[in-house]
Every structure is written in C-alpha cells, then in structure tokens.
Regions:
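Active-site microenvironments that recognize anionic phosphate/pyrophosphate groups
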Residues: 1-89
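Histidine- and/or cysteine-centered catalytic micro-motif in compact active-site loops
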Residues: 58, 83-85, 97-99, 139-141
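Short histidine-centered catalytic/ligand-binding loop motif
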Residues: 92-116, 171-176
Length: 192
C-alpha cells in the first residue's frame, strides 16, 4: 500500500472502507430517468421535448411532482432543479424550459430570465444555507463535460471555507451533509 506523510494513499481497487450510495445505482446502470410517482401527461410536454431528459420532464411536470423531481423553482421560461449527483450540498441546475443544446437557440428574453434565476437562487442559497461563495458554470457539449448535452443548464455550486476536505484526496469520495429531500424542503421553505 502506498503511503504519504499523512498516511495511506487511496489506490483504486484497494480494500478500503466503503461509503454506500444506493441511490446512484440506477444512474450507473443507465436506467435512472428520475421518473415521478405518476407519469407526466403526454400533452403537458413542451414541443421538441426529449422524453428521456430529466430537465424536460421537470419543465413539463406540474407542481405536485416538484418534490420527487427536485424542482425548487420555475418561471415562464426556466426551471430550477436540485442536482441529484451534486458536487456540494445545495448544487442546483438552472435550465431553459425547452430542450436545446446551444446558446444560439435562446431568445434574449430567455437568456435574461436564466441570468435572473442564477442571481435569485444564489441569493436564496446564501440566505438559507449561509454559503460564502459560488461556482457558476455551463458546459456546452459532451467534450466540455456536459452530462446532458442536449439541454442547456447552468450549475450553481455553493461553497464554504473548508468545504473540500481530505475525503476527495485520500478516498476519492465527497461527503454531503444533507439529503436531497431535506435540501428541497429547506430551499422551498426559504422561497415562501
């Protein structure tokens, strides 16, 4: 086993303690589309929606599906969803309602609405979760890191002093201190 001045070094495949994350199995196996308890009616889907896209599903769903889909906010042109595989606690996705993968396809009013959503939700998170900063990002295309290249979405990643600890470095894992459902409750309460 390799060691460092700070102890054993994490090596892929070595016998280590395990952190169980059973909610990731469907994603890893490619079968997790975030289906709500009740299907979204076909007539609710927007034109050109991708029925396999969780952001299109969130855009088409009614408020009764918001909790199970992680939707914390909507406007006439956008939807705000909790990232189910977050980089940090409070990681949100801000997406246009329509399924499109390029900025060129967005109208000026959509761009303005998306930017206003980023401002609003940074403020909500800062107040509700006392975050000290944010990383905001947009990955355009699969080679740029987009996990859903067909549906634009901005990441809001809250940050705190000392929020990255030894776990990612030594064990290759991140520890998130709050369940996604508790986060949904906290953020929706903060916007009431």
């Amino acid at each position: 086993m390799a060691t460092t001045p700070f102890g054993p070094r994490y090596t892929a495949g070595m016998d280590t303690e395990r952190l169980w994350a059973p909610w990731r199995l469907g994603y890893v196996q490619g079968r997790d589309a975030g289906d709500p308890a009740e299907p979204v009616p076909v007539d609710a889907w927007r034109p050109a929606a991708d029925c396999d896209c969780f952001l299109c599903r969130a855009a088409a769903a009614t408020p009764k599906h918001d909790r199970i889909l992680g939707v914390v906010g909507r406007t006439e042109r956008s939807v705000v969803v909790i990232n189910r595989f977050p980089y940090s606690n409070g990681h949100l996705l801000v997406a246009p309602l329509d399924h499109r993968g390029t900025l060129a396809g967005l109208a000026d009013d959509e761009l303005l609405d998306l930017q206003r959503c980023l401002v609003r939700w940074c403020d909500v998170i800062a107040r509700a979760m006392e975050s000290e900063g944010f990383n905001l990002g947009l990955n355009l295309g699969r080679v740029a890191g987009a996990g859903v290249p067909g549906h634009l979405h901005w990441h809001i990643v809250p940050r705190w002093a000392g929020d990255v600890n030894f776990m990612p470095t030594t064990a290759g894992v991140r520890v998130l201190p709050q369940s996604l459902d508790d986060l949904w409750l906290q953020l929706t309460e903060a916007t009431r």
